[in-house]
């Protein structure tokens, strides 16, 4: 569980309710799909086979080519914590554990070793989760070998009705579940529960968290587990999904063989979600948790959830509001970068909460001293959009991004991964939605998107925020006895402030061009690996590895000699500050916001990061935008913006970062352990809050600017491209920059093998928290990662511990 947030729907995929890993289809296919949906019902993915066994179990089979020789299984059981009574709160989740601990075909302790013998790892290949209204078992099967297939389905069948639920096994698991309860317990989790109790009053959600209660975890008798298991784990409440490198006939045979013998049931249980109590007046609520990371303010409208059938009309009905929130969030994103903005971040959106409530929300994160100004800022920005709407430039940018996302989804659909498909099909089944392809999604929505007007978006946003009373909530780590009254006063005062129409920024053209193209001066082919290595005339090395398993997706990394070990010795944490400067600063001639407008509709972007030895500039693109991506990445290499934008956001966040670390066990480890292990070497210790705050942009420029322009560099490109096509593009971009060093600098021995503590001690570390949580860490001193064979063996050893 994560802290409660109502996130807006920013990605274009949100306009298309089905899963969209992506795919390839021509214009005529889209038109054909559009005709087929004229009747009003979305067309199911034609490769998906849906059926039902005589016993009532529903199954879905989806042949899929990637990854080859593998398949994925999802067993979804239509039950979760909402089906629990007071005396069994947590049994749904507890059962999820128990099915691994003794079943028809596996005595307690036998299942996991049997899985490992066939190459299935718990956590990686096999996992499960419990939610309010479902329990889902997942297995990604690494082989089509008969013994592996048999094991996978035997286990899944045992999950379905073969759990032994032995009393000794239940008692042994109680401590593990208690530990998980404590791991989940956090300031954010506690704040979320208080927010839910306000927002979802009347529903059963605030009283039915999947982890349950400690009393039930520690004392629930075996008969409670058995009764729940036999009541809800029945064929009519199950959906089985198989997706992978299989034929429909294989899938059907497996379903019948392993699940056909389950007995038909007469399930009559009705899940009670309760009835949302809608607000009858505007209310204000102050929530205090002294260990909360930050202060957050939100304005929320909750309405009872209305189940809508999955029709073309209903899918399209949501588009104007989703686009309105996307444009509103772009405004908020731009605002946050201004030095005088009172908030760190803000966003708005609509979310359905477990089919119990539909919530529209706008929320912000801020420093405590700025909460009133932050609340006023989001209230007025929302009201500005409702009163004056959006302009054509904003809509054009949003439309370009939606169109690009849809087209990219279509292009890459052919190489969608089976594990993603299996999970998406299971979730479509859970929501009673038609599982559709990206081609179908775009056929449904394209006309609406292309003809959408600013006025339609404005009207949708206005409708969302009209006819209901908001709940205004502030959560903080500060006590405020008059908090609710102060919230209401600040909110009412903000409502009286006049707002003006939004002024859009003018769009610019991309400024950067490079010199004369470079040339390839050396070329090496490693045919067994399918790798081409180039040396360009300016010294840049290039590694090219075309692949076919991710259609129309290309990854590009510039690795420049330097990295964390090149940092000034005493500048602990400067790499954190540098990441903010480089990722938030845009280019010399363009801010990040300008680049977002310039590149709207293109699949391009650059992220800065670093390893111990290299500065990295990384991006992902497609064939159509490949040259633009290389131009952009080269511009980041040679002309970083070093703007204040990223620094402004980081400085606002620093107090929250350290407050969180002060009150969490992971923070205590991060702040204290490196100093112990590396004898207070500032290269490896976490910076103090004062030190991180003191850094300036000049410190970053002095560190990284010259290396980015001059140091040895390797360019690595992997993905769906042709080697001969990309070489001229490389020559015109990264090959056109000035000459660089032809080899990495030699690393000083004190950096290669820093002095470490003697590993013959134990130490207790403390941190300030009211939450009872302890972490035990063991450290072994090993050689560095330069010996690849040893590093792999150590990784295998590490895997053995899990």
Identify the residue ranges that each predicted region occupies.
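Peptidyl-prolyl cis-trans isomerase
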Residues: 114, 164-165, 169-170, 452-456, ...
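Hydrophobic, small-residue-rich alpha-helical packing segments that form membrane-like cores
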Residues: 161, 168-237, 241-243, 248-256, ...
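A common structural junction motif
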Residues: 156-165, 258-266, 381-390, 635-642, ...
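Gram-negative bacterial Sec-dependent N-terminal signal peptides
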Residues: 1-22
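M16 family metallopeptidases and their MPP-like homologs
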Residues: 60-62, 67-84, 90-92, 109-158, ...
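Proteolytic maturation boundary segments
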Residues: 23-61, 241, 247-314, 318-319, ...
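Metal-associated gating/positioning segment near the N- to mid-region
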Residues: 86, 98-106
């Amino acid at each position: 569980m994560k802290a409660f947030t109502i996130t807006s729907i920013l990605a274009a995929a949100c306009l298309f309710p089905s899963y969209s890993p992506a795919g390839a289809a021509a214009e005529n296919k889209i038109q054909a799909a559009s005709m087929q949906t004229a009747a009003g019902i979305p067309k199911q993915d034609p490769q998906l086979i849906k059926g039902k066994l005589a016993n009532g179990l529903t199954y879905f089979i989806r042949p899929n080519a990637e990854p080859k020789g593998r398949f994925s299984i999802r067993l979804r059981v239509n039950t979760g914590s909402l089906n629990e009574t007071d005396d069994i709160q947590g049994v749904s989740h507890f059962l999820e554990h128990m099915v691994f601990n003794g079943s028809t075909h596996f005595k307690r302790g036998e299942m996991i070793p049997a899985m490992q013998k066939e190459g299935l790892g718990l956590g990686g290949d096999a996992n499960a989760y419990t939610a309010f209204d479902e329990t889902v078992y997942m297995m990604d099967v690494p082989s089509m070998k008969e013994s592996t297939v048999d094991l996978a389905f035997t286990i899944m069948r045992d999950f379905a009705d073969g759990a032994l639920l032995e009393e000794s096994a239940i008692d042994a698991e109680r401590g593990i579940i208690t530990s998980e309860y404590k791991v989940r317990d956090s300031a954010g989790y506690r704040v979320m529960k208080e927010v839910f109790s306000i927002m979802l009053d009347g529903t059963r959600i605030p009283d039915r968290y999947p982890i349950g209660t400690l009393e039930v975890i520690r004392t629930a008798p075996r008969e409670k587990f058995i009764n729940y298991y036999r009541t809800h784990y029945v064929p009519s409440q199950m959906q089985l999904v198989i997706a992978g490198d299989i034929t429909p006939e294989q899938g059907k045979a497996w379903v019948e063989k392993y699940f056909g013998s389950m007995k038909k049931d007469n399930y009559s249980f009705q899940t009670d979600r309760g009835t949302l109590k809608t607000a009858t007046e505007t209310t204000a609520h102050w929530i205090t948790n002294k260990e909360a990371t930050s202060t957050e303010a939100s304005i929320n409208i909750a309405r009872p959830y209305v189940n809508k059938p999955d029709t073309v009309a209903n899918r399209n009905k949501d588009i104007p509001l989703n686009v309105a929130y996307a444009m509103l969030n772009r405004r908020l994103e731009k605002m946050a970068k201004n030095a005088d903005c009172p908030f760190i971040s803000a966003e708005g959106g609509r979310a359905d909460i477990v089919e119990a409530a539909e919530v529209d929300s706008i929320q912000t994160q801020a420093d405590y001293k700025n909460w009133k100004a932050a609340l006023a800022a989001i209230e007025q920005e929302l009201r500005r959009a409702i009163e004056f709407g959006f302009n054509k430039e904003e809509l054009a940018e949003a439309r370009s991004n939606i169109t690009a996302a849809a087209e990219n989804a279509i292009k890459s659909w052919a190489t969608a991964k089976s594990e993603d498909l299996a999970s998406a099909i299971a979730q479509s089944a859970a929501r009673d939605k038609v599982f559709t392809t990206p081609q179908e999604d775009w056929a449904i929505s394209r006309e609406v998107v292309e003809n959408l007007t600013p006025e339609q978006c404005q009207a949708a946003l206005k409708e969302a925020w009209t006819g209901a009373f908001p709940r205004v909530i502030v959560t903080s780590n500060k006590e405020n006895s008059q908090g609710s009254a102060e919230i209401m006063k600040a909110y009412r005062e903000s409502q009286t402030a006049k707002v003006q129409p939004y002024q859009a920024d003018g769009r610019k053209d991309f400024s950067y061009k490079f010199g004369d193209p470079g040339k390839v001066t050396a070329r090496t082919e490693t045919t067994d690996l399918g790798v081409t290595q180039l040396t360009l005339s300016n010294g840049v090395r290039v590694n090219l590895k075309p692949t076919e398993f991710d259609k129309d997706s290309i990854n590009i990394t510039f690795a420049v000699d330097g990295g964390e070990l090149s940092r000034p010795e005493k500048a602990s944490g400067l790499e954190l500050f540098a990441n903010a400067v480089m990722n938030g600063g845009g280019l010399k001639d363009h801010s990040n916001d300008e680049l977002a407008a310039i590149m709207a509709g293109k699949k391009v972007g650059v992220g800065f990061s670093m390893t111990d030895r290299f500065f990295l500039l990384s991006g992902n693109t497609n064939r159509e935008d490949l040259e633009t991506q290389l131009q952009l990445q080269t511009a980041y290499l040679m002309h970083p913006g070093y703007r204040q934008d990223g620094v402004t956001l980081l400085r606002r966040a620093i107090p929250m970062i350290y407050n969180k670390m002060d009150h969490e066990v992971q923070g205590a480890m991060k702040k204290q352990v490196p100093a112990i292990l590396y004898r207070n070497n500032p290269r490896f210790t976490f910076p103090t809050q004062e030190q991180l705050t003191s850094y300036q942009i000049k410190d970053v420029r002095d560190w990284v600017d010259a290396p980015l322009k001059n140091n040895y560099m390797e360019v690595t490109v992997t993905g769906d491209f042709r080697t001969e096509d990309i070489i001229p593009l490389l020559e015109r971009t990264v090959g056109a920059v000035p000459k660089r060093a032809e080899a990495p600098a030699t690393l000083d021995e004190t950096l290669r093998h820093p002095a470490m503590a003697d590993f013959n001690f134990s130490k207790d570390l403390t941190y300030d928290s009211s939450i009872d949580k302890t972490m035990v860490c063991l450290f072994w001193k090993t050689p560095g990662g330069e010996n690849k064979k040893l590093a792999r063996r150590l990784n295998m050893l590490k895997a053995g511990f899990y």
